[in-house]
Amino acid sequence: MLSRVARCSRTLNQVTRNGQSGLFSAVLRTSIRQNSTDSPASNNANEIYTKLSDTKDPQRNQFFQYTWGSWLTNDKSKKKQRETTFSIEGLTLFIDRINQLESKLAQPKSLEGAFVLANNKELLGSTKDKVIVRSIASIHEGKHHRVYKITLNTGKELVLRIPYKLDSDVAIASKLKSEVATTDFLKLKLGLNVPRVLAYGVDSNNEIKSPFILQEFISGELLMKKWHPLLPDSEETNKRLHEVIDPIAQFQNKILSVTFNKFGSLYFHDDVEGSLQNDVPYEGETDSALSNRWRIGPSVERQFTRNKNKLQQSIIDQYNGPWDASNPTAVLESVADIELENAKSKLSLINADAGANENDRALITKQIKTFENLKKISPQLINDKSKSIMNVEELFKPRLYIPDLDPLNVIQHSETENYFIDFEGSTIKPFILTSYPKFVAYQGAKIYNLEEDVPGYKEMEELEKQQYEFMYYKTRNERMWEFELNKYRHDLIAIASPHIKVLKSPYLQALDVKNGKDYLYVEGSIVQLQAMWEAYVANELVNSKDTKFPIEYTAEYLDQHQQELSDYQLETVSSPFSATGGWIPQDMFDTLKAQGILVETKDGNYKVETEKVLENPPAQPEEK
């Protein structure tokens, strides 16, 4: 194996039956709380009184509207995408219908356009009367879905998750099917602490009138409250960091225990097409109740849905798998293929528009060039038979990957019991092509020892020291994750090699493309390989015997790319709220607007008045 690269190379309160009218009355609570735990509700929560039979009650609308923030551009349309309207009366009827089913482990049962996991029927509790919804509270407005807490007359509590309309109907349906099946697999096969799912709907053709997941409510506090990544080194700091890292590493270790027969994503047997139903997902299942429960179908990893609304589903279906376990390179190539097709589709739409913006045309053309380069180099990136990569065969075997392993998605139900939530976008892929959880991942310059790695550190001004300390703490946290991985799965530790990280960087950068100019990071990661290509070929790390770099770059092209990348990075750093895509928390948005810092333009968007920022500097914290 090559030596390590240089270190410095980032509450319907109570629902009562009205004896005269036969109607239900209700209180709906909207809360600003941003986690699905049982912390005390905010004093700012709004109560909305309504009758369940009055579907046209205008007071209901605000219960479904997005309220957690606003955007500088296209605010109305983005909030419209995040409206989560559903039928409250339909929910009540549906839940009572579930209560009439027999509790048994079987394939999800179709019920009024939705699907029920009858084996989890006990989540409804016990009552001689009808099961009635007593209250509904909005408890979380996330990036991809909204969460409501449902309280029943049995005393039981459920969570209703409604996805935002950010993707196509087909994509939303696939993601819901796969997430429920993945959660079910983690619970039944691996015995992990995850919420039990009671029912799900993949479209609006059900009594709830919306796609949804209805699942177990888990009480507790988020593990994130314990995460303090920038604490100085000490025994206490080490202990506190491990209190967060360890349970997540242990959870991952259990996930990695199963090797699958294909690359793709998990679904229930009946949720994949017939041609895929004969292939078991993994070998050695001895429980007859589980042997035909799950299957592997198309991948729901985010690159197959993010910003793909204008791409025909038939094209997406060509590239989203599933793939045979013997062909891991297809997983790599699929990303380049889907992004290239998406860019070409966008260019076709621009060319068909006589009034199209030439800057948009130029940008898409550059994207196409980059993704053509990615398509060319992807099959050569990593040699899946390399003798220089320890346990390379294990690293390329199909294993389950959960992209949102994060303390924000871990609920401490008790001092010794953690529950994991949110498995959207989970996929089966080679472990070598996965990335570390975002809360510990660091792609910047590594500093392992402040005094040894930073010349003159002791003599630096405090502000300069803090910059290097930040880099050191991020490096330290990532290393702690790697030590845990090595402890549990030493056979997979080669993923920590700096060279492996560099080689798979173009693939990972492509997975992270969110806006038009992010292609620059993809290109940059390809360019980075050029200097080391001969050494990688000599050490059989890449899937090529040709020492000539696969992409021909001119000096002019590289200079232009470097300038455009630098300009984009400067634009990102200097533009307010660029890191959040122009999204601003609502309380901050209202304050900035009142101060005249945010000003509405003629087109309905908002701009930042720099001079007003200088007139209204952020308030300094009071001395205590």
Curated annotation (Swiss-Prot):
Residues making up the signal peptide according to the UniProt record: none
One Pfam family of this chain: APH
InterPro entries for this protein: Aminoglycoside_PTrfase, Kinase-like_dom_sf, Mito_inheritance_9
Coiled coil: none
UniProt keyword terms in alphabetical order: Mitochondrion, Transit peptide
Gene3D superfamilies: Phosphorylase Kinase, domain 1
GO CC list: mitochondrion
SUPFAM superfamilies according to UniProt: Protein kinase-like (PK-like)
First-listed, main subcellular location of the protein, grouped into a coarse class: mitochondrion
Intracellular or extracellular location(s): Mitochondrion
Family: Belongs to the AIM9 family.
Protein name: Altered inheritance of mitochondria protein 9, mitochondrial
Gene transcribed to yield this protein: AIM9
